A protein has these predicted regions:
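Short, glycine-/small- and polar/acidic-enriched structural segments
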Residues: 41, 45-175, 179-188
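Conserved C-terminal helix/tail region of periplasmic/extracytoplasmic solute-binding proteins
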Residues: 351-377
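Secondary-structure end/capping motifs
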Residues: 272, 277-352
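C-terminal segment of N-terminal export signals and the immediately downstream linker at the start
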Residues: 8, 31-49
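N-terminal export signals
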Residues: 14-36
Length: 377
C-alpha cells in the first residue's frame, strides 16, 4: 500500500521493543499504527468492557492508549457481557465476548451488531475441566461413555471445547452421555449468569434439568451424577471431597500432549467492536488491535523481568520458561492466521454438536479490516 491511500497514512511503524526486553531474551513485536483520516483532530470516546486480566490491565488503567481515543473501561463478567451485547442495551463500543455465543448468534440469528477483532483475551486448555466421582469406575476418558454428566448450562465455549476434544481425541459423542444441566452455578459470582446462547440444547440428546436448588458441585458431591464438565473448579474439588477428582490426574501433561499434537490453544473469549462504529471509522480496527497487543507485550515484559516477585507461585520463572519452550515466546498470540486452526475447530464443533445451523467460515466472524492483522514477532 502506498504511503497515503484512501485518506489514511500508514507510514509510521510502532515498535514494541525495549532494551530490557532484548536483554532478557523476549521477542519484540512490531505493529503498524494507523493514523486517523487526514485532517481529523477529534478524540473519540470509547466505552470498553472486559475482565481486567494482566494482559489487558495496561489498557484498562490507561497506561496503554487506543490511538485517537479516550477510553472508559468497565470490568465485567462474561455472562453479563454476552447478554448486554446480544440482547441488552449495547452500551459498550468494545466488549469481551464468548466465542461460542458469538458464533451461535451470528449463524443462527443473523447477529451483525458487533464484529470480532482477532484479539483473544482468554484461552484455556480444558482437560483440567473434567471432574469425576472416583467410585464410578471411571479411569480413562472412554469410561465416560454411558455415564451421567452435569454441566452448568450446555452451550458455553468451555463446554463446547470439552465435548469436542472428547469426540476428536477419544471418540466419545455427546449422544453417548446422559446430560444433567444444573439449576444453579456455583461460579456465578465470577462468570455471571449463564447467558442465553450458553444454554442452548440441541435436539436428539438425553438431557434433563437438575434440582433447581442444587448447583453443579452439589450434584457431583451427592452422587446424582458420575462426572462434571465445568470451566471453573467446583466447590467439592476445591474443598477436597474424598470422592471427587480430575479425570486426568496429570492434566498438565495431557494438555501439553494435546497442544503438541494439534497446535491448538483453545480460545474462550474474543474482542468484539460495534460494527456501525467501525463502518464509520475503519482505522479504529487496527488501533484497537494494536492497543490490546501492546498491553499484552507489557505483561510479557513484566513476567520475564519481575513476574516472580509479583506472583506468589514459588517456581513462577521456571513455569514461564517451560511454557515458552513448548509454545514459543508469544504463546498468547493475537491475529487470525496463527489462530486460524483453533477458530476453525471451534466453528466445526459448534456445527457438529448441533449448536449452529451452519458451518461458518472463520472470515465471516471478523471485521474485513482485521483479517490481515499480525503481530510481527
Amino acid at each position: 500500500m502506498s504511503k497515503k491511500q484512501n485518506g489514511y497514512d500508514d507510514s509510521r511503524r510502532y515498535f514494541l521493543k525495549s532494551s530490557a526486553l532484548a536483554a532478557i531474551g523476549a521477542s519484540a513485536v512490531t505493529l503498524t499504527l494507523p493514523l486517523r483520516a487526514s485532517g481529523s483532530s477529534t478524540t473519540m470516546r470509547l466505552k470498553v468492557t472486559g475482565y481486567d486480566y494482566d494482559r489487558v490491565a495496561a489498557l484498562a488503567t490507561g497506561k496503554v492508549k487506543i490511538e485517537g481515543c479516550d477510553l472508559e473501561f468497565t470490568p465485567g463478567k462474561i455472562g453479563e457481557m454476552n447478554n448486554e451485547a446480544f440482547g441488552g442495551s449495547q452500551t459498550f463500543d468494545i466488549s469481551e465476548i464468548g466465542l461460542i455465543p458469538f458464533i451461535l448468534a451470528y449463524a443462527n440469528d443473523d447477529f451483525r451488531d458487533y464484529t470480532l477483532l482477532p484479539v483473544f483475551p482468554l484461552r484455556v486448555f480444558r482437560h483440567k475441566s473434567i471432574f469425576i466421582r472416583t467410585d464410578r469406575e471411571i479411569n480413562k476418558p472412554e469410561d465416560l461413555r454411558g455415564k451421567t454428566i452435569a454441566t452448568p448450562g450446555y452451550s458455553s465455549t468451555s463446554l463446547t471445547w470439552i465435548r469436542g476434544l472428547m469426540q476428536d481425541e477419544y471418540g466419545i459423542s455427546p449422544s453417548d452421555i446422559q446430560w444433567v444441566t444444573s439449576g444453579k452455578d456455583s461460579s456465578a459470582d465470577i462468570s455471571g449468569t449463564v447467558s442465553g446462547y450458553e444454554n442452548l440444547i440441541p435436539d436428539g440428546l438425553n438431557v434433563k434439568t437438575g434440582s433447581p436448588d442444587k448447583d453443579e458441585s452439589d450434584l457431583l458431591e451427592s452422587g446424582e451424577v458420575d462426572a462434571l464438565f465445568h470451566a471453573i473448579q467446583p466447590r467439592g474439588f476445591i474443598q477436597g471431597h474424598p470422592k471427587i477428582a480430575r479425570l486426568f490426574p496429570d492434566s498438565r501433561a495431557a494438555e501439553q500432549t494435546y497442544f503438541e499434537k494439534t497446535g491448538i490453544f483453545p480460545i474462550m473469549h474474543a474482542v468484539a467492536i460495534r460494527k456501525s462504529l467501525l463502518d464509520e471509522n475503519p482505522w479504529l480496527a487496527q488501533a484497537v488491535f494494536n492497543a490490546y497487543s501492546q498491553a499484552k507485550q507489557l505483561t510479557y515484559k513484566k513476567m520475564l523481568a519481575m513476574g516472580w516477585a509479583y506472583d506468589a507461585l514459588p517456581w513462577y520463572g521456571q513455569e514461564l520458561e517451560a511454557t515458552q519452550a513448548i509454545m514459543g515466546n508469544n504463546f498468547y498470540s493475537y491475529g487470525l492466521e496463527p489462530n486460524r486452526k483453533t477458530v476453525e475447530t471451534l466453528c466445526r464443533y459448534a456445527f457438529e454438536q448441533g449448536l449452529s445451523k451452519r458451518l461458518l467460515k472463520v472470515e465471516e466472524l471478523f471485521s474485513p479490516e482485521g483479517l490481515a492483522f499480525v503481530e510481527e514477532v
